[in-house]
């Protein structure tokens, strides 16, 4: 694996670099060391989290979700090297093609339902963490905030955060969340319980 220079994305937990792996275009995500932690503890935490993220990506893929193919997990460098997915973020696509909102939102709802049916939550469902490929597939990326073996509360939080993020990123797209939940209900076992939990979260004011 060889990285190609400056980071293309930076977050609180890590940075993403363009790279190559055995001649294939790739991206490498490196977990950032935290100077305020004891070095041994910091390495242990970063190693656990990089392994967890890789496992979630693989589990999501096994559940029928389009995710990047993982090429390598380096527990020394605390990095994941994975497929460089071709396409554009859903955020950019909807900004440029708002007339496609209903179709894309239904695609989002179906894929989230498949995640939740497999007891996986993403933890940061935004249209910036979804890529629309040239083949029309929805690829979900960045599972760094995700978890598995989840309950209804986690699923409700996933949907609530998506609703808030969608409203903020795409305020001019009407009925978006409705399209998402309609598709979600068709695919998700026990969907109404999750939607009831979303309403409960709203009523509690927990994420408002």
Give residue ranges: language-model regions.
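Catalytic-loop of the protein kinase fold
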Residues: 117-127
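Conserved structural core of kinase catalytic domains
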Residues: 46-50, 61, 65-108
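Conserved hydrophobic alpha-helix
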Residues: 60, 111-115
């Amino acid at each position: 694996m060889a990285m190609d220079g400056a980071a293309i994305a930076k977050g609180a937990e890590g940075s993403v670099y363009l790279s190559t792996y055995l001649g294939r275009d790739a991206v490498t995500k490196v977990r950032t060391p935290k100077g305020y932690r004891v070095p041994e503890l910091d390495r242990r935490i970063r190693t656990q989290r990089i392994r967890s993220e890789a496992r979630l990506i693989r589990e999501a893929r096994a559940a029928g979700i389009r995710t990047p193919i993982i090429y390598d997990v380096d527990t020394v460098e605390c990095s994941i090297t994975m497929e460089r997915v071709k396409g554009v973020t859903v955020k950019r696509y909807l900004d440029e093609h708002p007339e496609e909102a209903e179709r894309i939102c239904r695609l989002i709802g179906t894929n989230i339902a498949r995640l939740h049916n497999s007891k996986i939550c993403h933890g940061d469902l935004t249209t910036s963490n979804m890529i629309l490929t040239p083949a029309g597939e929805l690829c979900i990326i960045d599972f760094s905030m995700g978890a598995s073996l989840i309950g209804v509360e986690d699923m409700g939080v996933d949907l609530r955060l998506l609703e808030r993020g969608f409203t903020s990123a795409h305020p001019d797209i009407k009925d978006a969340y409705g399209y998402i939940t309609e598709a979600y209900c068709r695919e998700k076992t026990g969907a109404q319980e999750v939607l009831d939990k979303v309403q409960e979260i709203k009523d509690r004011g927990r994420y408002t």
